[in-house]
Each structure stands twice: as structure tokens, then as C-alpha cells.
Amino acid sequence: MNDQEKSYQKILPELGDKTLVIPFTGDVNFSESEVVDRLIEIFGEVEIVPGISSIQVAASRAKVPLDKSKVITMHVTTPIEDKKLELQKALIDGFSVVLVPRPWPKQPDKHFMPSEIAIYLRENGFETTKMKVHVFEAITTENETNFEGTVKDLEGKEFSDLSVMVFNQASLDSYMNYRWQWEN
């Protein structure tokens, strides 16, 4: 972040009427709000141009509808204790969850990746041997991988910082279950 900040401060006085483009590797509307907020503080008006997010792609690959899911990011610098409780509640309430974990390898107390999440859920009473999960890494790239198994299987496994988890609790619920809409 220090180099990033230095770059912004160097560019600011030279920018004038020119347009500055800052590409993001993540979802600018999801896990990058702290950076966007800083850009607004420095440059004032900014235009955000969204793309297809890894969240959308992961949900699609896992066949988990976002309208029946909770989307949670742990990929923030602020404390995540409330987000951990939000994860528990969503799973207890039967929602699928699409989750961006928190890579922080230099500070193990803040590192909350799939293995740590699996242990956390088990320690909080979840039957992780019965919970289905996908972990997608480097999604939409030639290096994309997909782990599919149970949450218990994640314990001790390492995943990259380019990971998205999908806890799949979805069940089919097509419009055929709601015939009252068109039948008299």
C-alpha cells in the first residue's frame, strides 16, 4: 500500500485534465472498497467500470444461484469477527454462501483461508464432513483450479490468495413448484 500511495501522490499534481485508469484484479465493487474510497479522497470524482466478478463466475460454476445465497468477503483490513458470525448464520439458515477468504500469511492471526475457515466451522459445531464446498483458484485464467469436496477436506490444504469458496446448500426449486401462478 505504501508504494501504491506514493504512486497516487506522484500522479496527482501531474494529472491535470487527463484521465487516469486504475485496473483492479478483484471485484472493484466487492473487495476493493477501501482502495476506491482512497481514490475518491485523492482524485475526487471517479468512474467505476465493473466487470464480471469472480463471485459470479464461481457461483455459476458451482451451479449455486446468487439470489438464494449470501455473498461474504473476508478480504478486508478491518476486523472480521462479525463476518464470521454472518457466515455461521447464513449456513444455519440454509443459504449457500459465496465467500472471498482473507489471505494474510505474514500475520497468522488475521489469515482466514479455506483451511482456517474449515477448522473454525468445525470448532463452532458444524458437521463439516457433510457440508459441500468448492474452492476455485485463479478463476477464468489458464491456471484455474477447482477443489470440490467437503468442508472437512479443506483442513490442512493450502490455497492461493486468488481463491473463492462456494458452500453449496442449494436445492432445485423450479417454477414448476409454483404452478398456482398460471393454473386456475
Language model features by range: what are they?
Residues 2-6, 34, 53, 82, ...:
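Conserved active-site and cofactor/substrate-binding residues in soluble primary-metabolism enzymes
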Residues 7-12, 86-87, 117:
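Generic hydrophobic alpha-helical segments
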Residues 19-20, 91-184:
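A contiguous loop/helix-start segment that scaffolds small-molecule binding in enzyme catalytic cores
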Residues 26, 30-95, 148, 156:
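Class I SAM-dependent methyltransferase SAM-binding "motif I" and its flanking Rossmann-like core
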Residues 1-49, 163-164:
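Class I S-adenosyl-L-methionine
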Residues 12, 36-40, 56-60, 115-122, ...:
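Predominant activation on well-ordered alpha-helical scaffold segments within soluble catalytic domains
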